[in-house]
Amino acid sequence: MLKEGGIGLWELGHVGMASPGILSEDGEVILFAANLGFTGVRAAEELKKYFSCPVSLKNDADAAALGEHVYGAGKEYRSTVTITIGTGIGAGIVIDNQIMAGSFHSGGEIGHHIIVSGGR
């Protein structure tokens, strides 16, 4: 995409990546993304090998909600909820212009939750 847009790596100020699932508190590791088969993927660390700017990892529903809140249909409101259906079912929640990520960036995860070990 950068090449097609005529943008050099040195021109990037920040790189962002969104992933479904549960992320580490520091936003560096995809702890668990069942639908992708990921467990303990150090995604931000891997990206930092290729870019000389800061790298951020966000939950996909939170990233979608933030984009919709800032640039889309929610831009006129202080609080919004964005429901995502794709890599799972999730929600991004914005309250008073702040994303409410919750513990392990999973505050809006709606999809399948295991309640009993080995359960479905």
Roles of regions detected by a PLM:
Residues 50, 56-58, 71-120:
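Glycine/GP-enriched mid-protein hinge/lid loop-to-helix segment characteristic of carbohydrate kinases
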Residues 2-5, 10-15, 21-79:
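Glycine-rich phosphate-binding loop and adjoining helix at the ATP-binding site
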Residues 1-2, 98:
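An N-terminal domain-start capping segment
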Residues 20-23, 86-88:
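Short glycine-rich anion-binding loops that position phosphate/pyrophosphate groups of nucleotides
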